[in-house]
Amino acid sequence: MSATATVATTPEGIPVIILKEGSSRTYGKEALRINIAAVKAVEEALKTTYGPRGMDKMLVDSLGDITITNDGATILDKMDLQHPAAKLLVQIAKGQDEETADGTKTAVIFSGELVKKAEELLYKEIHPTIIVSGYKKAEEMAIKTIEEISTKVSVNDTEILRKVALTSLSSKAVAGAREHLADIVVKAITQVAELRGDKWYVDLDNVQIVKKHGGSINDTQIVYGIIVDKEVVHPGMPKRVENAKIALLDASLEVEKPELDAEIRINDPTQMKKFLDEEENILKEKVDKIAQTGANVVICQKGIDEVAQHYLAKKGILAVRRAKKSDLEKLARATGGRVVSNIDELTSQDLGYATLVEERKIGEDKMVFIEGAKNPKAVSILIRGGLERVVDETERALRDALGTVADVVRDGRAIAGGGAVETEIAKRLRKYAPQVGGKEQLAIEAYANALESLVMILIENGGFDPIELLVKLRSAHENETNKWHGINVYTGQIQDMWSLGVIEPAVVKMNAIKAATEASTLILRIDDLISAGKKSEGKTGEKKESEKGKEED
């Protein structure tokens, strides 16, 4: 039921209004039905993008900016969703993306399927609490199954890591260049991975991504160092410095203006000359101080005066100005240097080291490359592409691929894709359900059906008959040795996905299942939807005027 205001009555029958005027309340089955409809609507929007043969979405914002993508997190982020249940799915997707960098569509679509199956059980008068309990038991069995069937992988298994990257990239718009991009991803992750105790750790902040419009996706390259998207400030400076000693400055190489307003009265031209000479001496002293430390490269976050540029060039020092703060922080980690805020405090111990600093022309722009840094746990990926939208989509694809390969390295477990895991879990859930018995059995079977719905969507997006292939896939999984059998969405054949190279991180699948189960059970538990009334502009204006009057009094 729904109502525009909540009204209670006293024993004498006198009505008591609880909510403000304009508020609305929907409760009981009607509230559940509305929430389920909202979740299903979001799922429908993402369904066609699922899998390597999924379609793309064109999203146009209020300013007319266009985004073409099939990245689940990006689509949901760009959609201006209003319903609270739909917003909940966006939060689930963001959490999944931040946690594992992939599996957002799996989490959202699976949430939608779980809610759909629950709706069917609700029509059979099965209470939501029983459905939630059954779903939780099914989730535990699903996670246990993945842990049992997953395969151990180490950072040295580069071929498996490459297949993980290829699997992630195959569903993106950049699939045509996936071989080249997969190699870059694996090289980047194996470079920055480090062993801490008995576990591998990957800090993706050590992988810098720089975008530059022009060329093609196949021109994308990995650089074992840091790229500063700036050019050398003075034409007289060297464009290449070997055995670079790098000063990282968070201070300007300019004459600082006084904080207070000050006037200088000049009575004759000689005083003016003295004033300018003094400014020049201040800048020269700053440059001399830098040179005394042995620095031959300066990366400055702030400005560099033309006079300072001249003196730096005379001393053969390569300088870059207006560098990003994040670039300075990355350089500090990579080169072993320290960012200094006061040039007078700069010493030789603050300098970073790199074997090569060089300015290179990329397309129409010049960039500074710092390679062979003291700490090798820092790499950069320079993305190229003919269109800006292609470059943006390549960045999204690379971030997902980097995240999935990093997940495998950190967790050390991988599984096959192509619907193999979902089918295997569904098979085990159907055997497990009768052991639980009662109405919960129906909820566990519904959970299994929801998992298989993911497989059917995968098949459907590949252009094949989902019912026919799902029956064949179920039959294949009856044999215990066929746990990795799934759907080849390019041929429509049932094949061993592991042998085919369709490999995914186990942790991504587990997180997606947990997130989807949590979201669906949360929605099923809601039986009351209370919406506050919107403030009218008139009332808001009157309130502001009254507040203003009080302030004046």
Swiss-Prot record:
One of its GO terms (molecular function) is unfolded protein binding. It comes from the Archaea. Residues 534-553 are annotated as: Disordered. Keywords: ATP-binding, Chaperone, Nucleotide-binding. Forms a Heterooligomeric complex of two stacked eight-membered rings. Molecular chaperone; binds unfolded polypeptides in vitro, and has a weak ATPase activity. Belongs to the TCP-1 chaperonin family. This is Thermosome subunit beta. The gene is thsB.
